[in-house]
Amino acid sequence: MYGNMNNGGHAPYGYNGYRPSGGRMWGMSHSLPSGMSRYAFSPEDTDFTSSYPGPSMNRRGGYNDFSGGGGGGGGTMGSMNNMVNAASTNSLNCGGGGGRDGHGGGSNGTNLIVNYLPQDMTDRELYALFRTIGPINTCRIMRDYKTGYSFGYAFVDFAAETDSQRAIKSLNGITVRNKRLKVSYARPGGESIKDTNLYVTNLPRTITDDQLDTIFGKYGMIVQKNILRDKLTGKPRGVAFVRFNKREEAQEAISALNNVIPEGASQPLTVRLAEEHGKAKAQHYMSQLGLIGGGGGGGGGGGGGGGGMGGPPPPPMNMGYNNMVHRGRQNKSRFQKMHPYHNAQKFI
């Protein structure tokens, strides 16, 4: 094993190899933190064995070799193509087909985003959960590429749009290890989703997701909805967000439902774009702080108009120079008081 090395065939410095008479496996003999065994890094401790049919796993000190090609870009866990679930023959691809933004390579109708995942949930568990709906192209949990820490959300791309729709209806809102999953369509960024999210108020306090679909579903495809609930009671607060697939659908819903009393409600709905609601809320908050107001007016004999932060600020004072002059005056007066003969003529 070590015959080609210039150390007489012995193990390299820093390692204890297999002994002819039997004994311990090799381990690092360098100094380790107190309380940790020098043989804690034995290859047997990190040797993985496959419990499911799939790619061959070579022993490489804890690293697994996964055969098969991965997709281009966006895979934070690398290419894990051809990992097969024990109860299925469909491949689990945790890195293939990813885009630059990490949203996966599926179309908008098949690619789902899953939020609020348990921190200890694995890709295999996620795959097994969604594979019950239908065949999956890609499935991956987004993690920190250095630490492997889960960010708590994942992307699942189905082979068929009908399966993605059934996954939203069946798995959205289920509880996994005290975490309530949120399953919805993964939306691309940029201008394509602008002006599609609606902010709805004055809804009945007994509103449900199905009733919200009945009210808004006739105007277009709803890709995401969220009914705000009271944190203590869990009951609806009469406020919801509804996101459509196209901005034209959102505008049609605004025109048809704004200031209209739906069935089961006692007051008219207020339906507007969520972006406008956010801007109005921010402007109201700024006005409460007095940061938005009338400009300062000048006038006549120095009569100044008030309001807000009107008028330019005064020019900054040269504080450094003023402090130096003041300090010099202080020292001079103090010196004169301490030495009464300061102004006396010198004696020769």
From Swiss-Prot:
Top-rank taxon, per record: Eukaryota
UniProt keyword annotation of Cell membrane present: no
One GO cellular component term noted in the UniProt record for this chain: ribonucleoprotein complex
The RRM domain, residue ranges: 110-188, 196-276
Keywords: Nucleus, Repeat, RNA-binding
InterPro entries: Euk_RNA-bind_prot, Hud_Sxl_RNA, Nucleotide-bd_a/b_plait_sf, RBD_domain_sf, RRM_dom, Sxl
Main location: nucleus
Region (Disordered), start-end ranges: 296-317
Pfam families according to UniProt: RRM_1
Family annotation (SUPFAM superfamilies): RNA-binding domain, RBD
Localization in the cell: Nucleus
GO BP term, pick one: sex determination
Gly residues composition bias: residue spans: 296-310
Keyword flag Repeat: yes
GO molecular function: mRNA binding
Role of this protein: Unknown; apparently not involved in somatic sex determination.
Protein name per UniProt: Sex-lethal homolog
